[in-house]
């Protein structure tokens, strides 16, 4: 319950300080304008514009938890934050998810209207089917960001890890292009990674609204979510051990 309250508080703060979300929304609309023209030039249908609208929506709403954790460690604030009775790890997750939900609503509202105008029609029914899965995928992205932030206990600067992870997400997750247009060997590689269900798995419902596909994506997200949560808990315990050894 404490972490639900923390997430709700972070959401209220994000709602009051919504300038950043509005700036991201403006950038999002600009991206949609460019990419919609690209897809139309390639002769693709409007459902592909909605696909990109979905993947970019979740990506642009991501909170930069890794930067926040890195700053806590660099400033030395981490010692007293960890000493609090509420878990630092799940506090950061709750804050990131709470503030991220506000960005999802603001950016999604603006982008949904823009995509509707650019495609000349309402979203395909698969878009509505994808929204619950998008929320679950977004939660997993928050967990990834937290794990990258914890790496600062060992490497100090998390930017190299974040850069590599981001590029893998963009390429193997199918940020700009559905995996179906990739070479077959690259498709097989992507489907073996956690990145494919994070973006492509649910966003492709925009042009393939198959309930069986949605169910498969749900199972993949849940499976990778369990594995990622276990890894995150293990990593956090190792980080606490590093603090104890260093006299933190």
Where would I find each of the regions flagged by the language model?
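Hydrophobic transmembrane alpha-helices and immediately adjacent juxtamembrane helices
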Residues: 1-248
């Amino acid at each position: 319950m404490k972490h639900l309250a923390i997430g709700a508080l972070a959401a209220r703060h994000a709602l009051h300080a919504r300038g950043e979300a509005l700036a991201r929304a403006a950038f999002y609309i600009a991206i949609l304008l460019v990419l919609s023209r690209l897809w139309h030039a390639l002769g693709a249908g409007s459902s592909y514009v909605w696909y990109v609208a979905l993947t970019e929506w979740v990506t642009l709403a991501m909170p930069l938890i890794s930067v926040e954790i890195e700053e806590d460690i660099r400033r030395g604030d981490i010692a007293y934050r960890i000493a609090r009775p509420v878990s630092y790890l799940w506090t950061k997750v709750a804050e990131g998810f709470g503030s991220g939900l506000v960005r999802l609503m603001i950016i999604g509202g603006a982008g949904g209207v823009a995509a509707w105008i650019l495609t000349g029609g309402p979203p395909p029914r698969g878009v509505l089917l994808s929204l619950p899965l998008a929320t679950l995928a977004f939660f997993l992205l928050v967990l990834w960001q937290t794990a990258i932030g914890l790496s600062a206990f060992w490497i100090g600067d998390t930017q190299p890890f974040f850069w590599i992870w981001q590029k893998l997400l963009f390429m193997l997750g199918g940020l700009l292009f559905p995996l179906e247009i990739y070479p077959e060997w690259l498709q097989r590689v992507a489907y073996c990674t956690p990145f494919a269900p994070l973006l492509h798995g649910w966003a492709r419902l925009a042009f393939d609204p198959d309930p069986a596909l949605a169910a498969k994506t749900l199972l993949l997200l849940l499976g990778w979510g369990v594995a990622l949560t276990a890894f995150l808990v293990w990593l956090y315990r190792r980080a606490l051990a590093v603090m104890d050894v260093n006299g933190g």
